[in-house]
Amino acid sequence: MSDNDTLFWRMLALFQSLPDLQPAQIVDWLAQESGETLTPERLATLTQPQLAASFPSATAVMSPARWSRVMASLQGALPAHLRIVRPAQRTPQLLAAFCSQDGLVINGHFGQGRLFFIYAFDEQGGWLYDLRRYPSAPHQQEANEVRARLIEDCQLLFCQEIGGPAAARLIRHRIHPMKAQPGTTIQAQCEAINTLLAGRLPPWLAKGLTGITLWKNAFFNPCFVLVAR
């Protein structure tokens, strides 16, 4: 992960820890205290007394627990929904991408999505495998092709909305697009995936999971809504 990506995810954690403040307020506050361009290294040097002295709100309630979350985010100790895990001696057997604006709820439209949260699954369960962003730099490819290539190692994509042409594009990349009901959390959908994988897989999914003998074919699980076939 580049420094730019590391900075982005730390800042996202900070924005979520300080919902009473606008993102621009938080950036200006930290930039003022650091005295330099914000980098992961500069964020980690900031102290709570230093930040408290210039806190940009007279109405936001800063409890010890909230300060603890802020300082942890500055130092790179991100909350569980933003913390990549590398469990020893476990190999991903299925990867699912979630299009989300916050890493908590499946609330992204694929054609507008900029953040993708990749979860890996095996017989023991799932874990946050990677965090990916739609690139900000100019690119030659069509936007949804860029998104498809960003998650092309995944077998499933969960989003709130997706258009027909975009769904067809994903299927050409051997990614199955799935629409989640409004308000569905990533955690709830991961639990549904675990339940599915503990039983028998639908043929269209089992076909893409070569070398897995524990997961067998079955009818399609009603936990999921298939966008296109």
From Swiss-Prot:
Per its UniProt entry, which superkingdom is the organism in? Bacteria
SUPFAM superfamilies cross-referenced by the UniProt entry: Nitrogenase accessory factor-like
Give one Pfam family: Nitro_FeMo-Co
Keywords on record: Nitrogen fixation
Supply one GO BP term. Answer: nitrogen fixation
In the record, the note on similarity to other proteins reads: Belongs to the NifX/NifY family.
Q: What is this protein called?
A: Protein NifY
Q: Which organism is it from?
A: Klebsiella pneumoniae
Gene for this protein? Answer: nifY
